[in-house]
């Protein structure tokens, strides 16, 4: 493998420094777990670094990285081992606290987390990342119609599960919390 040009390494380092916080937000919203989002971002940035010399237009590196984040997250969620989680409490002894109230944001987040990977990615990209249907379709490597269908089905499921009396929380700039 040929040595990387210093200009490629510098351009990549500048890209990571400037855009990694935004990319982390996308990774967190897509995968739903802070530590897994860090791993997802790291793995995605490694893939971008490997492909960096082949990128025709470095200005499209962010879109390319988001696409890698989404496809890698979908791939991870398909693995059987992804759904295995360590817990501090055994399921048979865990008793939910009846006095604990669930906030609207927690309910919304929970329902978003229950969606299948492609539906979740479509909702996150459309509404959390505020991307157009065309941009979302491009990142997900599908048609605009597929994005519309995935979003429609996902929102229908969420409405059904949350009920008619659910009032969504006001938009908040601090969506990502560790």
Give the positions of each predicted feature:
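A short, charge-rich alpha-helical start-of-domain segment used by transcription regulators
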Residues: 1-25, 35-38
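Sigma70-family region 2
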Residues: 5, 43-60, 79-81
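Acidic, proline/glycine-rich intrinsically disordered inter-domain spacer in sigma factors
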Residues: 2-3, 10, 14, 80, ...
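Structural recognition of an alpha-helix C-terminal capping motif at a helix-to-coil junction
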Residues: 39-46, 59-71
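Helix-turn-helix DNA-binding module
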Residues: 4, 113, 117, 129-149, ...
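C-terminal edge and immediately downstream basic/flexible tail or linker adjoining helix-turn-helix-like DNA-binding
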Residues: 2-3, 11, 138, 156-178
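Arg/Lys-rich amphipathic alpha helix in sigma70-family domain 2
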Residues: 53-56, 67-88, 100-101
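A short pre-motif secondary-structure segment
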Residues: 122-126
């Amino acid at each position: 493998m040929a040595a990387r040009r210093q200009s490629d390494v510098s351009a990549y380092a500048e890209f990571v420094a400037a855009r990694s916080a935004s990319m982390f937000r996308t990774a967190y919203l897509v995968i739903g777990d802070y530590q897994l989002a860090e791993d997802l971002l790291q793995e995605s940035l490694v893939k971008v670094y490997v492909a960096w010399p082949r990128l025709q237009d470095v200005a499209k590196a962010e879109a390319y990285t988001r696409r890698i984040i989404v496809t890698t997250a979908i791939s991870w969620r398909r693995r059987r081992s992804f759904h295995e989680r360590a817990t501090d409490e055994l399921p048979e002894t865990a008793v939910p606290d009846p006095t604990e109230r669930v906030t609207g944001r927690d309910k919304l987040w929970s329902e978003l987390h229950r969606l299948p990977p492609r539906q979740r990615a479509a909702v996150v990209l459309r509404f959390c990342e505020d991307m157009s249907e065309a941009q979302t379709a491009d990142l997900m490597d599908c048609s605009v119609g597929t994005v519309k269908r995935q979003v429609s089905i996902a929102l229908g499921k969420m409405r059904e599960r949350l009920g008619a009396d659910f009032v969504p929380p006001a938009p908040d700039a601090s969506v990502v919390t560790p």
